[in-house]
Amino acid sequence: MKGKSGTLCQPDRSALLFDTDTRKLPLKKALEFWEESAGSLYDFYIATPESFYTHGRTLCSGKILLNYCVSVEQKLSRSSYRIGMDGFDHYEVQFFLDGMWRRGDGKLEAQAGSGDLIVHDTAQAHAGSASDFTNVTLFVPRFLLAPLLDRPDEQNMRVIGSDNPLVGLLRSHVIGLFRTLPSLDAAQAALMVSPTVELIAATLNGTERQDNSRGVAAAQFNSIRGYIDEHVLDQGLSVEQLAVKFGISLRKLTYLFSREGGVASYIQKRRLHLARQCLRDQRHAHKSIADIGLEHGFLYAPNFTRAFQQTYGMTPRETRAMARRTWLAGERESPSWFYRASRWGL
């Protein structure tokens, strides 16, 4: 896969990557295809595997993928351990056209039916179930969408009803893309990325009405969060320093980051994310676990290991060991999920 400026589409191919109907295949081959595709992200349990089938089409629009899928009742889950193992990190913006999805992690009650919008964040744990279904899903890299969101880390398993006008607008756009992309070449399809991502952001940001005071608070939060993201590895970064920098009280700063578990929690989460990337990158293979922890704000290796394991379900050493298997296979890092998904039809 190319870098952030690249495209998943092949210059000599249309935006349609593949069209698969497993009813034309033996059951074993159908299940193998599902393991390769859905199983690349999720652990799944199919209620009646003997009757399994899926019909799917995947299209490419620059750096994003659009998938149409018909399949049978099943449960899908994505654990913190798996997140730490594969490092995949993107959003799934999904509309159920038929059937129903239900959240299953026990934290919140949420379900979606025909026309409703569901958002999944592959950097966070997932547990859900679906009846026999038809859905359309946009797979969007985090680096494209997160900077445009007011709350980029609060979208996982979020459901917004079909009666919301912005949801209706986005749904019409996505269905229009699905119908139009097969007739476009790679260059034309890539032009649709920016307006699509901006419409997603507008929908997710605009579905909760804010009064003026909440709007000001959101603007303050976004400004401070951006500063933290840019200076997250600075040794002097602290709650007190941020309060002085932005001229607000410690109490107000704590309030702004209450949904993140506090300022210190947000800083640690960002540092752990960067540390995980470093552990998986062969260019940093010469560094010890303790050195990587120190570079990312952890003075003591045991504290780094404990925080990392609590977040990702595995230790830094286990994460590096898994990455090393990939290095030994001659690859610098795990193939991007988008790269793999764009080539299932080849």
Model-derived features with residue positions:
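Alpha-helical bundle regulatory/interaction domains
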Residues: 2-55, 100-252, 259-265, 279-302, ...
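Short acidic-hydrophobic surface loop/beta-edge motif
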Residues: 55-61
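Short, conserved glycine- and acidic-residue-centered signature motifs
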Residues: 86, 217, 268
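Residues within the DNA-recognition helix of helix-turn-helix
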Residues: 256, 307
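Glycine- and acidic-residue-biased ligand/ion/polar-headgroup-sensing regions
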Residues: 62-64, 70-77, 81-102
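His/acidic/aromatic-lined binding-pocket segments of jelly-roll/cupin-type domains
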Residues: 58, 83-86, 90-95, 110, ...
